[in-house]
Design a protein with these regions (language model features):
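N-terminal Rossmann-like NAD(P) cofactor-binding subdomain of oxidoreductases
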Residues: 2, 10-19, 23-251, 255-256, ...
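Active-site-lining helix/loop region of Rossmann-like oxidoreductase modules
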Residues: 15-18, 22, 228, 246-384
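Generic structural "secondary-structure junction" signal
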Residues: 25, 221, 322-325, 388-392
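Residue-level signal for secondary-structure boundary elements
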Residues: 39-40, 155, 376-379, 394, ...
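C-terminal non-catalytic interaction/assembly regions of soluble proteins
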Residues: 373, 385-398
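Residue-level detector of conserved catalytic or cofactor/ligand-binding positions
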Residues: 398-405
Length: 405
């Protein structure tokens, strides 16, 4: 059946949570520079990848699929620091000043709205540009008004909300997350132990008919309550946790081992990172959220229950170390102990000197554009087709058929 897709007319507002962060400013600068012809959108599937047509001709995806043109994007968002996007990008030190100056006027015009923030969910951050709300429900109402105001002020036809802020502390799924009614009650009761700021952003976005993308490993839209709400409002949700650096390498190597039926005894991964993300993850409660996300990758690929002789006893360790001198230039080391024919051992060492935000920025842009496409195509709920971009891709348990034994 042919899918009817509404055209990408008018302006698309992209509201970023953490708009002054390294990932957000890098994405914004690159997008603005690309549409001025000052840079190429390297790493962006929506902008550079091709698809094969019926006659074997290759065409750019953006020339076939009705994606929003970069010229029609308007950026805005929230941040716990008041700096405009130019000042924030200078602070992040991801990009050279000469690359910022080409779009300086546009960056200076992007001023963050006060953020919905709770210090208890990111203890290493101490922002001053913060909303005052008596309850989580009031926080949601303020965010909804922000979305409406931005949409009207910038004459936007559509909005996408993107979480590019820090990783929140780890919390397990609880009763308050199991239904929309329970979630809303917890927000109104101001249950700050189980309702995170990111959940308030997600709820506000969905309530305003805006797709929501979760770029961190937070427990947020991967809950039955949010699945229910997104379907009720016919809004797409996507996530979670951008698959950009070390985990990207894992998802390349692990399928190779499995395809060749090579066994794995152990996989040790460590990183050093010096940006605000690294600072937040230096707190054990926040690191646990990231650790759970990063550890989940290889089990899903290896299927140890199916191949116990090869992957039934893999020792998998992940560490992230805050090291300020490196700033955004993350370095990742992996030691992989594998075994082959007749059980003989071998080792693989991977040393990836990467730029964290340079890898994440095009992922963020692609998820925004594809989420907007999904909205115009009438798709709602979890967008499993966007799993490729995420460390912990979400899935709706109600869609999984479990056979009776």
């Amino acid at each position: 059946m042919k899918q009817e897709i509404k055209p990408a007319t008018g302006r698309l507002g992209v509201l970023v949570v953490g708009v002054g962060g390294a990932v957000a400013t890098t994405m914004i600068v690159g997008t603005l520079a690309s549409r001025k012809g000052l840079a190429k959108p390297i790493g962006s599937i929506t902008q550079l990848a091709t698809m094969r047509m019926e006659n074997n001709e290759e065409k750019l995806i953006k020339d076939v699929v009705p994606l929003t043109d970069l010229n029609d994007i308007v950026f805005g968002g929230w941040d716990i620091f008041p700096d405009n996007a130019y000042e924030a990008a200078m602070y992040a030190e991801v990009l050279k000043e000469k690359d910022l100056n080409g779009v300086k006027d546009e960056l200076e015009a992007i001023k963050p709205m006060p953020a919905a923030f709770d210090h208890n969910w990111a203890k290493r951050l101490n922002g001053t540009h913060i909303k005052k709300a008596a309850t989580r429900w009031e926080m949601v109402e303020q965010l909804r008004q922000d979305i409406r105001d931005f949409k009207a002020a910038n004459n936007c036809e559509r909005i996408v909300v993107l979480w590019a802020a820090s990783t929140e502390i780890y919390i397990p799924l609880s009763d308050e997350h199991m239904s929309l009614a329970a979630l809303e009650k917890a927000m109104k009761d101001n249950n700050t132990e189980v309702i995170s700021p990111s959940m308030c952003y997600a709820y506000a976005a969905i309530a305003e008919g805006a797709p929501f993308v979760m770029g961190a490993p937070n427990l947020c839209v991967d809950t039955p309550a949010m699945w229910e709400f997104s379907k009720q409002k016919n809004v797409p949700i996507a996530g979670k946790d951008f698959k950009s650096g070390q985990t990207l390498m894992k998802t390349v190597l692990a399928p190779m081992f499995k395809t060749r039926m090579l066994g794995v005894n152990g996989w040790f991964s460590t990183n050093i990172l010096g940006n605000r993300d690294g600072e937040v993850l230096d707190d054990p409660d926040n690191f646990k959220t990231k650790e759970v996300s990063k550890l989940s990758v290889i089990d899903t690929i290896f299927e140890p229950e199916k191949y116990p002789d090869l992957y039934g006893d893999v020792y998998h360790k992940v560490r992230i170390n805050y090291y300020p001198p490196r700033k955004d230039n993350k370095e990742a080391w992996d030691n992989i102990d594998i075994f082959g024919w007749m059980g003989y051992p071998m080792e693989i060492k991977v040393n990836f000197l990467c730029r964290d935000s340079i890898l994440a920025a095009p992922i963020a842009l692609d998820l925004v554009l594809f989420s907007d496409l999904a909205m115009r195509a009438g798709m709602c709920g979890i967008q499993t087709w966007l799993s490729f971009f995420c460390k912990s891709p979400m899935h709706d348990l109600s869609l999984i058929h479990i056979s009776e034994p």
